[in-house]
């Protein structure tokens, strides 16, 4: 303020550097917790949602914008539109494929959206709906802070732990190069 008001030429605060603090390592979801979440799902939609998030690492916004027509079950891939409307292909595992197919067979609506609400009028699921549902599932099992982005972080961490190059992981996650 003194510098802005021309009472002093240069603030002595400019010589003071911020102290670097350690960034806490962000938590991932354990394999056991993933299995417990799967086992606790009471509807096919939630199971398909968990497996798709876990196996692809897509953002929750990409998940809710997916349409059934963008899923290729033969190739086990789907086209997602990420940040800045960037299109990319992501691949899901066999478990996700089975649970997605079970979920789609159980649906009685004609909505083109991949994930819809459980009750009529079966609207496209919103980001908040996914977040709330995952939080509820986690709380039922006394699992702390279960949210969509944690699945993304878990997928990336597992891929790196298994030896995948970080550049490849960034590409899968849709990070700009």
Residue ranges and their predicted role:
Residues 1-177:
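Conserved catalytic core of the tyrosine transesterase superfamily
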